[in-house]
């Protein structure tokens, strides 16, 4: 009998058999493809890409040719060698290796917390369950968006891309975070919260009556439709609100700053269900550990690929440790009966209580919420340095006519914040490395986008086309035939060229024997998958306030 613990559909974290054998998913640990992992680890046997024909039908009587045998050999040895190098570098064995990438630094952080009374701080500031639910509503990921005025239009000229160096680690070192339990507060205006935002963290529901962008030339609207708890007659731009009759959203003071810069509210706005907590910097033992992780990663550039890969994963995982949901569904599957069990029947509040009482819980969730908010604000500061802001993705901006003086001023402010906290630059191979600064990441002569995670560029130096399309491998750029005019809604990236595979799951009622004598049951088919490029819909600014609504006024003096 086999029991399978699943983190999401078709992605088991591990499989445990009654005879003691446990199968662990190395992909979740590596957080990259076997090809990339073997390259990063510089193992003897790299993945032999291109030697396997995925369209060929094989069974137990098929004779493998030399290329197929070589592919199988390299696939197996690459995985074994990558895993062994990881074990050796971490001083772990197959029993003690963490299941996931975030497990690598977790043990170190827990030991540091134990030595520095981190658990005591956690118990002092951890939120109750009701506040935790609100924090999860406030939390958002990275901001990814394109300029609606240039949808499906090829932009030509000198297009530069800037990105932040270790954006999230920088935010964890440079800014203040909620450092006490949240306390209830009366309804208030956004202006009141912004006036006190330096010393206090706020979470609240923002009520906006007739919100609208102040100017149509605001290129990146911030209000996210999917995070709104209520929206009436919203006109959206690829998931972001341009205007609406009414909107409600849980947010904090840092995100509020951007919202108030961009939107007017003809009918007024109000903050309700307000809670606040005093701010302070993250504990020194934690920020020192983050900074040392950055130093280690930087000093390993061009050195031992194994140690560099692990150091990079460690640095990138420190933020993720702060925003893991304390209560999440855990699915178990009995492979003999095929039955699933989910812990959704358990009381979420009770599960949260167990999480807070666990001695290994040392990093409060609210810290991670503010990390993404600070990074969100920094991204908009970076975007404001571009004369024309074309595209943004979490920690990078594509644009034209960059204001170099504003960029330099921003970078200088980043360095000052770090120096004020006692953290400087790292010198390696005659170069200076800083956390958080905006660095030139590429120059392009052409740019076109049809939506978030769907854009193509022409490199200014090489003249080659490159694409970023969620769900399409980078080699899909070949489909464009060196012409960005082909990058439009309705264009098909064919699976034969891109190498993208579609997973088709076949579920059988019983085990049966096929014509080749194979016992068959549930199976997965991999076949070439084409990708149809679509585009975001151009918005109609006149389509607003189409229906009569009745808005509850929470405070007559403010609304």
Show which residues each predicted segment covers.
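Conserved acidic
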Residues: 1-559
